[in-house]
């Protein structure tokens, strides 16, 4: 109905909310972060049979938010779970806190970030949600099999960035790369 479409369009203009994923990509930009203040973690769900992506950020030096030990895979101790981390740490645990971005395109509605345990590794995959003909991409790996809180290391070409609106940085992270893997100029 034309009246409903007009109302939705007017509401979008009034609120400034984007109407499509492509529009969303052009409304927001991406700003660099100090990646040494972040750790990407395969965090167990329930009894630990499956895992999800958590990203922890150290915002101040008041006390440590996480500790990393070992290698291949490294184990993460989420210290922030043991104190009120307000103003000290940030924790990003789902699509409200992070999404996939490639170049100028925010792919948060078209890809989900999923932790998958293989026989020899723990991988963070970008999996298409709407178009199964789109590629699944390996974004990060642990470097070996493991259970519990396992550190994920970004693959070459990927990095963390913060969502930006105009000159204002927002509390949303991008798992970012300049171009699609395998495309000309991509790492």
What residue ranges belong to the model's regions?
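C-terminal segment of classical bacterial N-terminal signal peptides
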Residues: 7-20
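Extracellular/luminal recognition modules and glycoprotein regions
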Residues: 21-81, 117, 130-132, 144-187
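Acidic, glycine-rich flexible loop segments
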Residues: 119-141
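Structured domain cores in non-transmembrane regions
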Residues: 57-123
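N-terminal chloroplast transit peptides
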Residues: 1-2
